[in-house]
Structures are given as structure tokens and as C-alpha cells.
A protein has these predicted regions:
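Conserved metal-phosphate-binding beta-hairpin within the catalytic cores
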Residues: 248-273
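Glycine-rich phosphate-binding loop of ATP-grasp-fold ATP-dependent ligases
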Residues: 135-161, 187, 210-228
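Phosphate-binding site of ATP-dependent enzymes
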Residues: 158-213, 265-273
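ATP-grasp fold ATP-binding core
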Residues: 128-151, 165-182, 262
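Structural motif
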Residues: 3-8, 55-60, 179
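ATP-dependent carboxylate/phosphate-activation module, predominantly the ATP-grasp catalytic core
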Residues: 190-247
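Conserved N-proximal alpha/beta basic substrate-recognition cap immediately N-terminal to
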Residues: 25-132, 142-143
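N-terminal-proximal low-complexity accessory segments that begin disordered
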Residues: 1-37
Length: 273
């Protein structure tokens, strides 16, 4: 059974088994359900003998499926859910970026600015003040354009600092980074099986608006790689892909089974190239 729950990020961040996502998030999942065609099943037509494949596991979806009659043996344990929450933390992406920088030979194509994890509103305010121009603050557990806060060193508001305090109180930290001028968003998609084997499944080409997802381009890997290589040599993209695979083998294998997407973007360099 395939279960599309795009509200997953919100549910994972909240952590409550009874959390009810916003109506807009639930509507998006319902509207896109038809894309799964024959493999889609709602809670009224669950096949109890099939493996369950959800968009993302969290306490809320586990509780919903359990109430619908799914046996515990088909559901992840709370230990599994804690591992997923740990892996989906933006700290994992930061560790991945550091790993890629240390292993990719043509690192001159990688951005120089590194995101930082900050643990106090004071540190966040100092980060904003010390980086002229636009900066972005992110909730550690968030996705799809949610949990983002654009800030500027020339106009720090009480609301900005309040957002930091609230996010840190709920999630323990905030991620901070300097705004880059993005020219193309994309992702690399992988799968880890029960034996720990990692397969590269392909590329994803998509568009965003101020960090929020807007649309995907449905195309072959060859087309996507050709599109990306207008900005970055294809061999560099492949080298990054191999580095991500090694990072997954070193840091993720054994703690997670299923699909993994690594979001990336190509941005303009300091010289405008």
C-alpha cells in the first residue's frame, strides 16, 4: 500500500500522535492521490497483507494507520521513528555538506558559505548582524518551504528574535545561512534496502519560490543532467552523487530503510557566474 502524506514534515516536527495538520496540507495530499492511480488506497480500503510505503513516517501517520486496523508488525517502532526524526534534522544535511566538501576534488564548484546551527536567540542575532544583506533562518525540522525566516542585518525585528526563541524552545536550535542567488533546484534520489545496499534512483528537477516548492519538471535523467551541466560540469555532479552515496553508507546505513532524497541547488558565484 502506498500512502502519500505530504504533511509529513509538519507532523514529524510536532511529534504528537494526535496532531492535525493544516487543512491546506491535507488537501494537497488528497488532490495528488490520483497520481498513484491503482496503487493508492485510503484508510477504508487498506490491504492488510501488503507492505506499507508512506511518503514519510511520523507518530501521527503511525497512529492513523493503527486506528485504521494496521497491525503493529507492519508499523515502525517508536525507536524507528526517533531515528527518522534524527536523520531528517537539518543537522544531517550540514554533516553531509561537510562530508562532500572533504571528498569532492573539484570543490571550487561548491559554495563557500556553510550553514550554522545556533542554540540561542543571541547567537542568531549576532549571525544576522555579522552577515550584511539577506540571511535565512530555518527550523531544524521542517521542509517544503515551511519553517523558513528571511532576515536582514539592517532591519532585525523583535518578531525575528521572537521566532528564534520560539523555534529553539520547540526544536532545540535554529539553522542559519547566507542567502544565495539560486538559479536551479534539483535533488538526487536514493534507496537503501534491508541489506544496507544503496542504489541511486535518479535526479529530480524542480522549482521553488523563496524556498517554497512550486513545481516539478518530469523528464529523463539524461535531460536533467544536460540541464544542470549548463551551469556545472556533468562530471562534478556525478562526483557529488558518489560522495552522497558514500555519506549514506557511512552515516545512514543500518538506521534507515527506504527512499532518501538529497535536495540541492545551483547558485550564482561571487563573480555572477
Amino acid at each position: 500500500m502506498f500512502f502519500f502524506n505530504p504533511e509529513h514534515d509538519l507532523c514529524l516536527a510536532n511529534g504528537d500522535i494526535n496532531f492535525m495538520p493544516p487543512a491546506s496540507a491535507l488537501k494537497f495530499g488528497h488532490d495528488c492521490a490520483s497520481l498513484l492511480e491503482d496503487v493508492y488506497a485510503d484508510s477504508a480500503n487498506i490491504c492488510h497483507n501488503q507492505n506499507i510505503m508512506v511518503w514519510g513516517w511520523n507518530p501521527s501517520i503511525r497512529n492513523r494507520l493503527k486506528k485504521a486496523g494496521i497491525a503493529e508488525s507492519h508499523l515502525p517502532s517508536f525507536t524507528d521513528l526517533n531515528n527518522i526524526k534524527k536523520l531528517q534534522h537539518r543537522r544531517t544535511a550540514l554533516e553531509g555538506l561537510k562530508f562532500i566538501r572533504s571528498s569532492v576534488q573539484q570543490c571550487n564548484y561548491l559554495v563557500c558559505n556553510s550553514p550554522m546551527e545556533l542554540f540561542s536567540a543571541k547567537d542568531a542575532e549576532e549571525f544576522i548582524r555579522n552577515n550584511p544583506g539577506t540571511t535565512m533562518l530555518k527550523a531544524p525540522l521542517s521542509g517544503s518551504g515551511k519553517g523558513l525566516r528571511w532576515t536582514n542585518s539592517s532591519s532585525i525585528s523583535h518578531s525575528d528574535i521572537g521566532w528564534c526563541r520560539q523555534t529553539i524552545a520547540k526544536q532545540g536550535s535554529v539553522m542559519a545561512e547566507i542567502k544565495e542567488e539560486v538559479v536551479q533546484d534539483f535533488a538526487m534520489l536514493f534507496h537503501i534496502d534491508t541489506d544496507g545496499n544503496i542504489d541511486f534512483l535518479g535526479y529530480s528537477l524542480f522549482n521553488t519560490n523563496n524556498g517554497a516548492y512550486t513545481s516539478n519538471v518530469l523528464a529523463s535523467d539524461d535531460f536533467i543532467l544536460k540541464t544542470l551541466s549548463r551551469y556545472i560540469p556533468a562530471n562534478v555532479i556525478r562526483e557529488v552523487r558518489n560522495s552522497v552515496t558514500k555519506f549514506l553508507q557511512t552515516n545512514i546505513k543500518g538506521d534507515y530503510t527506504g527512499f532518501i532524497g538529497a535536495d540541492m541547488f545551483i547558485c550564482k558565484g561571487s563573480a555572477g557566474t
